[in-house]
Amino acid sequence: MRATKIVATLGPSTDADAVMRALFEAGVDVFRLNASHGTQDDHARRIKKVRELEAEFKRHSGILLDLQGPKIRLGTFKDGPQFLKDESVFTITTERVEGTADIASTSYPDFARDVKTGDSVLLADGALHLQVIESDGVAARCRVVHGGMISDRKGINLPGVKVSTPSLSKKDVADAHFGVEQGVDFLALSFVRQARDVLRLRHLLEDAEAKQPIIAKIEKPEGWQNLDSILEECDGVMVARGDLGVEMALEKVPAIQKTIIEKARARGRFVITATQMLESMIESPLPTRAEVSDVANAIHDGTSAVMLSAETSAGKHPIEAVRMMARIACETETSIQQQGFLSAWETQAQSIPEIIADAAYHCARTAGVVALAVGTTSGSSARLLARYRPPVPVFAFTSNENVARQLSIVYGVDAIVTSGMTSTDQMLTEMEHLLVSTSRAKPGDNIVFVAGQPVGLRGSTNMLKLHRVAGIR
């Protein structure tokens, strides 16, 4: 069983029923909807299709709605794309104008108040570099340091500038409510700068009586600097290397990625590594060798999941991209287990559930077991076990379909929905039956059984049993 989860972004390239079915068969664990593109009707249609495939394949998949966030963009250009020459002057204004090679508007009303003389302005993901000459609070005149083609609604990045945009725009609030109504399983918050950004979204969800896990996207220098406090408030993080690599020096991104993964794992947070993982497969049926190494290295770092963006949403080979990512993950995991690269997180257990998880991991390493079977109400026990990166699958048994879907992102966890159970004996009997009947275990195999007493009480994990499978009764 592949332990590293695959997140695939849906879009025009995946809308055909046959493609969606093939993605499901290829092993996508979580389907991502990018709120920056498409309409709510588009996303609702895709959500409906994922749920239909879930029922058909009898396998739970997560749906992640990625909120756009306060992305700063240029306006539109009167005569189409324009070429900005090196050393020319280009003005960015908060007033509405039709763009030319000399001036363009911006969607961000405080742009000219936030920047000052000498600040860098990067356009189109860093392809063009401007430097502010002067700003009067309405418009900023900029020298074109490195020019190029520019077109409608290209992104603006302001490295080193503390922008005053709110963490949640009106569009984000509307999209978050839409996601809750549609029953998505995760919400990703873009351009997180500090812990209170996460708390704003958390409070919005609480007001709606919703409990979707929040993924903090680390893509701003402030988010990187405040990582520890952000990790305290979020449920998972995304290493969003696109904007991160624009606003910070590119050569720093690999080390930042490793640190984010390490710290997230230490706190028991799942982590998604994203952006340009198999970028060449937007056009090519095969990735570059460097891209294969990039995916493998993220898995060596300990990421919970790897993500495909335009490769699946707009690329020519979405199915091949997922299959390739799955093959890379399986091969890398085999290498890791053989060579012991990915060790358990060495930490001092602080609670009874942590002590049980630590003991279960060591049983998995030394007792010849084929699986860890855990009964879970909220999913927390399964997430604790996954933190240790055990060498065998974690089968999480829960009576809650939402919990099963939320575990779809967690490394090494396969969630199975069961009926409600009233005792650990009943739980073990049903687990054993399901594992054998689905060929996940066979009579004579050893498994580690983890549960809590009293059954059904959140956070009650307090027992471990090394159990030999007897077979179907």
Where are these regions (language model features)?
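Non-catalytic helical/linker scaffolds that mediate oligomerization, partner binding
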Residues: 1-473
